[in-house]
From Swiss-Prot:
Region spans: Disordered: 60-82
Keyword list, A-Z: Coiled coil
Source domain of life: Eukaryota
Gene designation per UniProt: STMN3
Coiled-coil ranges (or none): 75-179
A Pfam family of this chain: Stathmin
Residues in SLD domain copies: 38-180
InterPro entries according to UniProt: Stathmin_CS (IPR030514), Stathmin_fam (IPR000956), Stathmin_sf (IPR036002)
UniProt-listed SUPFAM superfamilies: Stathmin
Listed name of the protein: Stathmin-3
Cellular component GO terms held in the UniProt record: cytoplasm; neuron projection
Keyword field contains Coiled coil: yes
């Protein structure tokens, strides 16, 4: 106590009264303040206008003293009655069945969706094949008609040439008979 009083007396000599009052109300923390929380230490490193930086140091399990409470141990459970255990088991079984039913429902919906997609793809493929076949048949029919028309035109020209040749021969024979 005496050392504290003498320290204050020395401080009084060095500082003005206003500075002393301000220092009592606004104490500055130690620059490397260390805070301890259970099995970790938080050390303040830097304080800037943009923010603060800290260093978090975790103690290893061997460093934990026996006086500190073990945080990872589960809380003590009270003894449960047989009825309570049975009720919990039934509730867990019900949850398991509900979850299993939900999974089965989702799988059934997924399979149904896959079937619908496959059916739609097959239908579109069949429609495409049918349209392509119809288009090909139309083109083949059109080509056949054009070919037949062309052949008919060639036959007609050939018949006309033969008729003309026959007429020319007749005229020549008639001229020979007349002249000769």
């Amino acid at each position: 106590m005496a050392s504290t009083v003498s320290a204050y007396k020395e401080k009084m000599k060095e500082l003005s009264l206003l500075s002393l009052i301000c220092s009592c109300f606004h104490t500055q923390p130690h620059p490397n303040t260390i805070y301890q929380y259970g099995d970790m230490e938080v050390k303040q490193l830097d304080k800037r206008a943009s923010g603060q930086s800290f260093e978090v140091i975790l103690k290893s399990p061997s460093d934990l003293s026996p006086e500190s409470p073990i945080l990872s141990s589960p809380p003590k459970k009270k003894d449960l009655s047989l009825e309570e255990l049975q009720r919990r088991l039934e509730a867990a079984e019900e949850r398991r069945k509900t979850q299993e039913a939900q999974v089965l429902k989702q799988l059934a919906e997924k399979r149904e969706h896959e079937r619908e997609v496959l059916h739609k793809a097959l239908e579109e493929n069949n429609n495409f094949s049918r349209l392509a076949e119809e288009k090909l048949n139309y083109k083949m029919e059109l080509s056949r008609e054009i070919r037949e028309a062309h052949l008919a035109a060639l036959r007609e020209r050939l018949r006309e040439k033969e008729l003309h040749a026959a007429e020319v021969r007749r005229n020549k024979e008639q001229r020979e008979e007349i002249s000769g």
